[in-house]
Amino acid sequence: MIVKTKEEVVGTPREIFAPNGHWISRRYLLAGEGMGFSFHETIILAGTKTHIHYQNHLEAVFCVQGRGEVELIPSGERFLIEEGVMYALDKHDEHYLSASEEMRLICVFNPPLQGNEVHDEKGVYPLKKGQ
């Protein structure tokens, strides 16, 4: 059984800060735990808009706090994200994630992240060796 507390993640290499300052990702489960997915708590900072395109991963997201929106590219279709809303990027959907107020999101990735991935210039988490 795997049990991790917030105190075991915050301030360690499992807490990743976006280079652009838009988000903080606390990675509780990673590929090395062998679960077949990774599990994260992600904080999206208020007033930010982030381009994301997970070409190599599927992601499901559940909002537990805050408010924002997902805007699909290129259609421009928008979805309100607030407490109690789940969205799943089941088609590797390219999108913008905007936060009108700070959001706290619970995220699951498949394949699992290895640990320190950040979005590249195209909004992608590159695959690492073994994925």
Curated annotation (Swiss-Prot):
Which GO BP terms, alphabetically? ectoine biosynthetic process
Q: Which PANTHER family match?
A: L-ECTOINE SYNTHASE (PTHR39289:SF1), PTHR39289
Tell me what reaction this enzyme catalyses: (2S)-4-acetamido-2-aminobutanoate = L-ectoine + H2O
Alphabetic keyword roster = Lyase
Record GO terms (molecular function):
ectoine synthase activity
Q: Where is the signal peptide?
A: none
Protein name, as recorded: L-ectoine synthase
Q: Which organism is it from?
A: Wolinella succinogenes (strain ATCC 29543 / DSM 1740 / CCUG 13145 / JCM 31913 / LMG 7466 / NCTC 11488 / FDC 602W)
Belongs to which family?
Belongs to the ectoine synthase family.
Is the keyword Ubl conjugation in the record?
A: no
Query: Is Lyase there in the keyword field?
Result: yes
Q: In which pathway does it act?
A: Amine and polyamine biosynthesis; ectoine biosynthesis; L-ectoine from L-aspartate 4-semialdehyde: step 3/3
Lineage of source species: Bacteria, Pseudomonadati, Campylobacterota, Epsilonproteobacteria, Campylobacterales
Role played: Catalyzes the circularization of gamma-N-acetyl-alpha,gamma-diaminobutyric acid (ADABA) to ectoine (1,4,5,6-tetrahydro-2-methyl-4-pyrimidine carboxylic acid), which is an excellent osmoprotectant.
Q: What Enzyme Commission number(s) does the record list for this chain?
A: 4.2.1.108
